[in-house]
UniProtKB/Swiss-Prot annotation:
Biological source species: Polynucleobacter asymbioticus (strain DSM 18221 / CIP 109841 / QLW-P1DMWA-1) (Polynucleobacter necessarius subsp. asymbioticus)
GO biological process terms, semicolon-separated: translation
Task of the protein: Binds 16S rRNA, required for the assembly of 30S particles and may also be responsible for determining the conformation of the 16S rRNA at the A site.
One GO cellular component term: cytoplasm
Transmembrane segments: none
Keywords: Ribonucleoprotein, Ribosomal protein, RNA-binding, rRNA-binding
Top-level taxon in the UniProt lineage: Bacteria
Gene: rpsN
Protein name, per record: Small ribosomal subunit protein uS14
Keyword Ligase: no
Pfam families: Ribosomal_S14 (PF00253)
Subunit structure: Part of the 30S ribosomal subunit. Contacts proteins S3 and S10.
């Protein structure tokens, strides 16, 4: 089980990303727009850099929703590989079967 502080930190990051998503998208659109003046694009870049670091979605880490494990997490289920195995063997994930060929 991951430390509760690490799990809460990730939750806080997710809220920050959601809060600044629209503003980041607008600024990035201005920066990418070649028809805008260089000064305007430069100001947009400065504003983007002034946003909090945790507003960037790249800083988020996928964690297991049960254990908080940061590695080996499947996006489709939101669970770590070990927990997927346990739950799948109990038959609690519909449509998931053990591979055999």
């Amino acid at each position: 089980m991951a430390k509760l502080s690490l799990i809460e930190r990730e939750n806080k990051r997710a809220k920050t990303v959601e809060k600044y998503a629209v503003k980041r998208a607008e600024l990035k659109a201005i920066i990418a727009d070649q028809s805008r003046s260089d000064e305007e694009r430069y100001e947009a870049r400065l504003k983007l850099q002034a946003l909090p670091r945790n507003a960037s979605p790249i800083r988020q880490r996928n964690r297991c929703s049960l254990t908080g494990r940061p590695r080996g997490t499947f996006r489709k289920f939101g669970l770590a590989r070990s927990k997927i195995r346990e739950i799948a063997f109990r038959g609690e994930i519909p449509g998931l079967t053990k591979a055999s060929w």
